[in-house]
């Protein structure tokens, strides 16, 4: 009888030890965030881009010469990734990508490979050998692109043999100006810096902060950061525009703050702004 009792206690002790051992190991076997496979969606998204990447700010640096047929740009896009991404989908039409990378919060960089998609709407992708981690980072893309001649994106037109540039972004043509997450659900701030040959005006949404002459004689215009807006609301015009300064419109029952008022017209047509 004593032997059977001892055997029963021994069996119970072994069983309890196994249970405790399993409980102890569960912490070691817990799947960590680094072990989660990174997002790599194979099929180009139809309709909206995936929800895993959210843009929050754009800093766009352009060189535009209305006399030429193309422009160059460098854009920094601040993003937040909901989880690690080995592939990021975005919009790009007619851009030749010179370089692409992601800069992480610690200053390290991840090189990306750009692939232009055959999907409708210019849906394209950035592939990373080392995934972009969860959290905040910045996409940095250098590119060149032709001016559009069909009143879409950054288009070129001539009047009296003088070339002008202007934008028409709505509804989905900001993706012709800059690689971007070109959907109205994304509202972000935009900071533009635009260089152009002397003699041209540059007009954007932001207030002009500084104007600098570069070593090659070009003029660089630096603009204040906009409030958060959709990409189709970004506006840009470059060329020999005439300027008429209308002063500052004071606050009234409709607007709560003063608003600077200026008008631009093609060269030689400033007088037509008298009644604007």
Task: Give each language-model segment a name.
Residues 94-159, 216-217:
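A surface-exposed beta-strand-loop module
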Residues 83, 92-97, 147, 187, ...:
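Short proline/glycine-enriched turn/loop motifs at strand-loop junctions of beta-rich domains
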Residues 23-72, 159, 163, 184:
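N-terminal, polar/Ser/Thr-rich
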Residues 75-79, 128, 135-149, 190-198, ...:
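Short, hydrophobic/aromatic-enriched beta-strand segments in well-ordered soluble domains
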Residues 73, 170-172, 180-276:
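Hydrophobic helix-coil surface modules that form long, contiguous segments used
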Residues 71-94:
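Ligand-binding face of N-terminal immunoglobulin V-set domains in extracellular IgSF glycoproteins
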Residues 2-10:
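Bacterial N-terminal signal peptides that target proteins for export
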Residues 9-21:
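Bacterial N-terminal signal peptides
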